[in-house]
Amino acid sequence: MGFLTPKSFGEQAEDFACKMMKKKGYHILQRNARSRYGELDIIALHGEVVVFCEVKARQGAVSGSAGEAIDGRKQRQLGRLAEAWRLANPAWMAAPCRFDAVLVAREAQGWHAEIVQDAFQLGW
């Protein structure tokens, strides 16, 4: 395992997350969707549900819960980002949505990921 810059590490982690999501039946709609509120890592369709997915990457074993990785402030930010995306993409406005997390780790044996469906809910 060679040295990766933080940017390169994050990009590789997101690539691996997308690969794992596709294996689990997700259809990737968009990556790195930016707005004035920040950036959504991955937007996907899982069945009829629009999924806003946050990728959390670490060197070493995946440990802890998605709730620990995505605090309340980050959850609110992701909610604002999701709402902005839905407003900009009205075809998806009526579709149900949820927030998933992909916890990605790079270990000596390679990449590992855990997909956490409904990692948090905002109540809207």
Curated annotation (Swiss-Prot):
Molecular functions (GO terms): nucleic acid binding
Annotated InterPro entries: Restrct_endonuc-II-like (IPR011335), tRNA_endonuc-like_dom_sf (IPR011856), UPF0102_YraN-like (IPR003509)
Family to which the UniProt record says this protein belongs: Belongs to the UPF0102 family.
A Pfam family reported for this protein in Swiss-Prot or TrEMBL: UPF0102
Organism: Magnetococcus marinus (strain ATCC BAA-1437 / JCM 17883 / MC-1)
Name assigned to this protein: UPF0102 protein Mmc1_3298
Origin superkingdom: Bacteria
